[in-house]
């Protein structure tokens, strides 16, 4: 570990990140573990829970997503959930040990007509003693401020992949559209949850590029989710080759080094991994997971499995 590893840097070069990414695995893990020990000495693992508050029918054509109206995945579009149903889910999440509750809506952007109801959800979940997070697509001027006023802590808006590979995955929006919405959320004083998806056919250079783009956000995202692609029948990426677990762990270790003070979340795709593979990713630097049996429309490990996983790596809950 170098002294620069202890302080978040806004001046990472792509070449520097690539050099770290390509380190022998033992050296990479040793460096990541030293950073994790310096900033997260208790070894605790933060737990979030995710709920789809509006499922299906999205106008975007993200090649990985079951909720796009562009693909035949068998998923039916649904209306925005009642506030009471969302609050009930938040209470169950808290009872299960989650300290952050994330609400996701499948649409291109937040419409002003839906803003009051979403704001009510945020306020109600916040009143239950949970941190709040939403993922609502692109934001227009003034919307982020309204969400902040309602009590929003985090806005999730992933960059997905590198700038160069982005148009291979989605063509209904641009990489810079994502950057613009992140800027709106940050300007309103909302913390950022921003990461990407690995295993979409991208190269290692693209993974380096994603991490580099994230490092240019100032300040860094407070939460960096690292997702492993869950191939879904009917989507363009349904037949993607499965990402190697060691490659996923390598990416997580690099994220831990580049984002020393951020939560690095082992996110989607855990249900396809062995307990040993998940433990490796936590040991490599991840200190946050999603709990609950579903992540929007994909499966997630059962609570008892996660309890055994966290016990095996010695990671309790950070705030519970």
From Swiss-Prot:
Alphabetized GO MF terms: 2 iron, 2 sulfur cluster binding; 4 iron, 4 sulfur cluster binding; biotin synthase activity; iron ion binding
CDD domains per the UniProt record, alphabetical: Radical_SAM
Co-factor binding comment: Binds 1 [4Fe-4S] cluster. The cluster is coordinated with 3 cysteines and an exchangeable S-adenosyl-L-methionine.
GO process terms (BP): biotin biosynthetic process
Binding residue positions for [4Fe-4S] cluster: 58, 62, 65
Domain Radical SAM core: 43-270
InterPro entries the UniProt entry points to: Aldolase_TIM, BATS_dom, Biotin_synth/BioAB, Biotin_synthase, Elp3/MiaA/NifB-like_rSAM, rSAM
EC number(s) stated in the UniProt entry for this protein: 2.8.1.6
SUPFAM superfamilies tied to this protein: Radical SAM enzymes (SSF102114)
Domain of life of the organism encoding this protein: Bacteria
Group of enzyme by EC: transferase
Self-association and partners: Homodimer.
Similarity comment text for this entry: Belongs to the radical SAM superfamily. Biotin synthase family.
PANTHER family with a match to the protein in the record: BIOTIN SYNTHASE, BIOTIN SYNTHASE, MITOCHONDRIAL
The protein, known as: Biotin synthase
Native organism: Hyphomonas neptunium (strain ATCC 15444)
Gene: bioB
């Amino acid at each position: 570990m170098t002294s620069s590893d202890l302080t978040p840097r806004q001046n990472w070069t792509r070449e520097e990140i690539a050099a770290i990414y390509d380190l022998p695995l033992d050296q990479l893990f040793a460096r990541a573990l030293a950073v994790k020990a310096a900033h997260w000495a208790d070894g605790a693992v933060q737990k979030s829970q995710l709920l789809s508050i509006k499922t299906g029918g999205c106008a975007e054509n993200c090649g990985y997503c079951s909720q796009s109206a562009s693909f035949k995945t068998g998923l039916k579009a649904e209306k925005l959930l009642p506030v009471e149903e969302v609050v009930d889910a938040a209470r169950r999440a808290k009872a299960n040990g989650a300290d952050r509750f994330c609400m996701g809506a499948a649409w291109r952007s937040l419409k002003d007509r839906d803003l009051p109801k979403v704001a009510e959800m945020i306020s109600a979940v916040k009143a239950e003693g949970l941190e709040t997070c939403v993922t609502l697509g692109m934001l227009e001027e003034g919307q982020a401020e309204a969400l902040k006023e309602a009590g929003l802590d985090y806005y999730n808006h992933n960059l997905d992949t590198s700038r160069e590979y982005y148009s291979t995955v989605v063509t209904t929006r641009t990489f810079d559209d994502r950057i613009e919405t992140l800027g709106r959320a940050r300007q309103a004083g909302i913390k950022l949850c921003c990461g990407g998806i690995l295993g979409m056919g991208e190269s290692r250079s693209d993974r380096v590029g994603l991490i580099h783009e994230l490092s240019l956000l100032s300040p860094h995202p407070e939460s960096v989710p690292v997702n492993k692609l869950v191939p879904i029948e009917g989507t363009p990426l349904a037949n993607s080759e499965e990402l190697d677990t060691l490659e996923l762990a390598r990416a997580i270790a690099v994220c831990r080094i580049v984002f020393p003070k951020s939560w690095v979340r082992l996110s989607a795709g855990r249900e396809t991994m062995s307990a040993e593979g998940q433990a490796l990713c936590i040991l490599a630097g991840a200190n946050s997971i999603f709990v609950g049996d579903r992540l929007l429309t994909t499966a997630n490990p059962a609570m008892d499995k996660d309890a055994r996983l966290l016990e095996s790596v010695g990671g309790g809950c950070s705030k519970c």
